């Protein structure tokens, strides 16, 4: 296995080598979403100048799909990046340049919409790094952010995979649960009592839809905050329009919840 030297310094949270293998092992027990074949097609196909966008609500298997896909690729050529709110596109592109020079050709970037400047700078991923021969797969819960990026920066430069809708047939196959009541109770997501199919970080969260409070928490984190995050960052907030006053008063979340 070829690993970065000890002197290699990254500006974001980059995982390679044995760490990458550990991530792959963590999801080995899970079945694959039906959309996994679309992700496979992108990674194996010729899509120069395009990136793959994996988006959808929390707990619909996005991170698991990334880990399952990278487990099928040469570990010495594959890297995983977990974006944090303190990162920006400049830091990310510096790391992508380093990874390219080290021979990495498959890069999976999780929660990329946390970058405050993603919407206005996303084209660098498709126009530069994809054209250089890197296969880049990004994921995130902020569907509105991806939609706005596709409107401008990534117009005709992406292959999109939407994970939010999980048919009952697929739900039953993945969780081996054939109860329509359970499917409805948990909103068609893959998170249930003592079971976390998606992001390992969510393993300690309250179970979504168990009661009114957990349902409200899910809506706040998976929907309301994402909408506000996108409106704030897109073109420096110019699309807030009439929503700005509600946002500044801290009332926008309640309005979205009522809707």
Model-flagged regions — what are they?
Residues 1-49:
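A short, basic N-terminal segment
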Residues 54:
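Hydrophobic anchor at the beta1->P-loop junction of P-loop NTPases
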Residues 62-63:
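Conserved lysine of the Walker
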Residues 76-103:
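Short glycine-rich substrate-engagement loop in P-loop NTPases that contacts/grips substrate
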Residues 100-122:
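Conserved P-loop NTPase "ATPase switch" module shared by AAA+ and STAND
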Residues 128-150:
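Sensor-1/coupling segment of RecA-like P-loop NTPase cores
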Residues 146-259:
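Interdomain motor-coupling "hinge/lid" segment immediately C-terminal to the ATP-binding subdomain
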């Amino acid at each position: 296995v070829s690993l970065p030297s000890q002197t290699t310094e990254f500006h974001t949270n980059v995982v390679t080598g044995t760490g990458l293998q550990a991530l792959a092992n963590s999801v080995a027990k899970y079945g694959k979403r039906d959309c996994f074949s679309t992700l496979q097609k992108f990674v194996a196909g010729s899509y120069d100048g395009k990136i793959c966008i994996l988006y959808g609500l929390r707990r619909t298997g996005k991170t698991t799909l990334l880990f399952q896909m990278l487990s099928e690729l040469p570990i010495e050529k594959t890297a995983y990046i977990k974006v944090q709110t303190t990162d920006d596109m400049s830091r990310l592109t510096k790391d992508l340049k380093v990874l390219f020079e080290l021979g990495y050709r498959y890069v999976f970037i999780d929660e990329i919409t946390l970058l405050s400047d993603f919407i206005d700078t996303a084209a660098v991923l498709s126009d530069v790094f994809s054209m250089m021969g890197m296969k880049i797969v990004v994921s995130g819960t902020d569907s509105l952010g991806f939609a706005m990026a596709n409107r401008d920066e990534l117009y005709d430069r992406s292959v999109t995979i939407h994970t939010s809708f999980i048919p009952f047939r697929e739900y039953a196959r993945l969780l081996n649960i054939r109860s329509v009541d359970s499917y409805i109770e948990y909103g068609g997501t893959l998170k249930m009592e003592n079971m976390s199919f998606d992001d390992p970080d969510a393993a300690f969260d309250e179970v979504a839809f168990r009661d009114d409070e957990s349902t409200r928490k899910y809506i706040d984190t998976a929907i309301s905050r994402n909408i506000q995050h996108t409106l704030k960052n897109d073109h420096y907030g110019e699309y807030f329009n009439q929503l700005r006053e509600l946002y500044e008063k801290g009332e926008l979340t309640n309005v979205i919840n009522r809707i």
